[in-house]
Amino acid sequence: MGLRTMGLDSPAPGAYAFGVAVNEPNLNRTFYLPRLPREFYQGDAVVHWTLSISHRRRGWLTERFHASFRELMLHAAAREGVFCPTYCLMPDHLHLVWMGLRLDSDQGNGMAFLRTYLEPKLAPQKFQHQAHDHVLKEKERRRNAFSGVCHYILENPVQAELAKEPDEWPFSGAVVPGYPTLHPLQKDYWPKFWKLFAAARSPDAGKIIRPPIR
């Protein structure tokens, strides 16, 4: 049972819409990207999220921001029952992957929570009005394919010529509660991660009905 269902939830500075903090100024839905039905972001969903900075502005990415990001990701993990096996913070956008662990996990709520509390750390910059998402299909969730998705994310700094190797970039990692030093570039990471994931995942996490993704 999550914190929200226990009645221990405390409100964020703004109310939540699906994946969007309602205190964001632009709420004209004609400007929003279409999303899959909500159930695709609930339960055992696996989603690659990309949060871009408005006008691709830079100058906010620091060790202090990174620490704040990790702290808020831990709170999101506790609230919504998610693991983040990989994230990478870039100078003008953020990548993260969330994997649901419980039937009541809701990544839409998690993303609204994260954006609401993280955006003040960007000041004076702001996020674009909506995060982009890619819900992984079944074939993308198979272990070898999934690790390939995460590797692609970690390669972003190399592709952008910000680092020669992924491990030279200081703003990437994983957020698995209780394991602060776990990092997806460690040699033994994936066997350890899958063991932790299997232990944390509720047996009913996948008992949610969704039409197939085309």
Where do the language-model regions lie?
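Short catalytic/metal-binding and nucleic-acid-binding patches
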Residues: M1-R214
